Amino acid sequence: MSEIQLRPTVATDLQKLMALEHNTNSESVWQLELKRNTGQVSATFREVRLPRSIQVEYPHNKFALADDWVRKSMMYTAIMNNDQVGYLSLLERGTASVVWITDLVVDASFRRRGVASALLASAQGWAETRQHRRLILEMQSKNLPAIRLAQKFGYEFCGYNDHYYLNQDVALFFSKTLK
């Protein structure tokens, strides 16, 4: 198995990062059910297995990466066999104690090899050295692989936005308290 190397993203990485396969497949989704009663709104998410696997389109414009990366607080690139195989973007928003993971992408041919895990660990290390108290990871409710990864690393569901992405997909937010 090849070693995963992580480093801060540089401008020369961007073309290859934009060319990565950003979409994923999912066999289940987190389905939102809203119930509205007088003086009360109840939101429930339940995992629903689909009759067949669906392709989950990446919710951000991957071609805007060349413009957006300079606005990120930090961006890591994962390298295997001298190729860029994934990336993770971090953004300090609002309060200085919270960092958002806005992008976590691993090329399809390199998934299930520990790349996303290594990127998440680097994000946590970066946030801790900057004395942040919380990481928030965003993902689509259709992206069960990302939901499972968040849960595996101790992230807990902390909210949603039902029209967060341009394609109107539901965004889920998972957070992790740092030491």
Regions flagged by a language model, labelled:
Residues S2-Q5:
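Extreme N-terminal starter segment of soluble prokaryotic enzymes
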Residues A11-T12, A19-T102, D107-S109, L120-S122, ...:
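Acetyl-CoA-dependent GNAT
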Residues P59, E138-M139, G154-L172:
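Conserved catalytic-core motifs of GNAT/GCN5-like acyltransferases
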Residues D107-R113, S141-K142:
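Active-site acidic-Proline motif in GNAT/NAT acetyltransferases
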Residues S117:
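Residues forming the Rossmann-fold NAD(P)(H) cofactor-binding site
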Residues A127-E138:
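Conserved GNAT acetyl-CoA-binding A-motif
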Residues A146:
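Helix-turn-helix
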